């Protein structure tokens, strides 16, 4: 059994992460899950949420948009629409997006064609605000 997981995280635009990590957690379609070295092969879809990993005793956090997460032979492949590291998120911009999405949603009903668009924008902004507030910890 390997002692580390090899993680490759990519978006359609760039490779965001290529690291060997001790453990990783993410938000799947059915809830949060974690992966350690030696995990069985696994494939799931991801929803808007947080990805966290530990490397050498330090926690790192990222905000993710929808995508896929695969584990095979101690290699984790993550393909997502967008990914932002906690220290790269502009907190004021994320808070402004959260406020705009809240205002738009209040004016809509679930039957409106744009309701789901603003609901997803609200989810993204909320995750970005939460992740931006997490400092790297030992």
Swiss-Prot record:
CDD domains in the cross-refs: F1-ATPase_delta
Main location: membrane
GO cellular component, one term: plasma membrane
Subcellular location field: Cell inner membrane
The keyword Zinc is annotated on this UniProt entry: no
Gene3D superfamilies to which the protein is assigned, alphabetical: ATP synthase delta/epsilon subunit, C-terminal domain (1.20.5.440), F0F1 ATP synthase delta/epsilon subunit, N-terminal (2.60.15.10)
GO molecular function: ATP binding; proton-transporting ATP synthase activity, rotational mechanism
Pfam name, any one: ATP-synt_DE_N
Topology relative to the membrane: Peripheral membrane protein
Residue pairs linked by disulfide bridges in the UniProt entry: none
Keywords: ATP synthesis, Cell inner membrane, Cell membrane, CF(1), Hydrogen ion transport, Ion transport, Membrane, Transport
Purpose of the protein: Produces ATP from ADP in the presence of a proton gradient across the membrane.
UniProt-listed NCBIfam families: ATP_synt_epsi (TIGR01216), PRK13446.1 (NF009980)
Quaternary structure and interacting proteins, as annotated: F-type ATPases have 2 components, CF(1) - the catalytic core - and CF(0) - the membrane proton channel. CF(1) has five subunits: alpha(3), beta(3), gamma(1), delta(1), epsilon(1). CF(0) has three main subunits: a, b and c.
Similarity section: Belongs to the ATPase epsilon chain family.
Designated name of the protein: ATP synthase epsilon chain
Native species: Geobacter sp. (strain M21)
């Amino acid at each position: 059994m390997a002692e580390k997981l090899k993680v490759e995280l990519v978006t359609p635009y760039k490779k965001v992460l290529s690291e060997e990590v001790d453990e990783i957690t993410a938000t799947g379609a059915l809830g949060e899950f974690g992966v350690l070295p030696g995990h069985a092969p696994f494939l799931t879809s991801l929803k808007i949420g947080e990805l966290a990993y530990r490397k050498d005793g330090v926690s790192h956090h990222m905000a993710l948009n929808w995508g896929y997460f695969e584990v095979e032979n101690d290699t984790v492949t993550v393909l997502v629409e967008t990914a932002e590291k906690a220290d790269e998120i502009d907190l004021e911009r994320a808070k402004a997006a959260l406020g705009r999405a809240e205002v738009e949603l209040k004016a809509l009903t679930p039957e409106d064609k744009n309701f789901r668009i603003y609901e997803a924008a609200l989810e993204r902004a909320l995750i970005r605000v939460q992740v931006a507030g997490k400092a790297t910890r030992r």
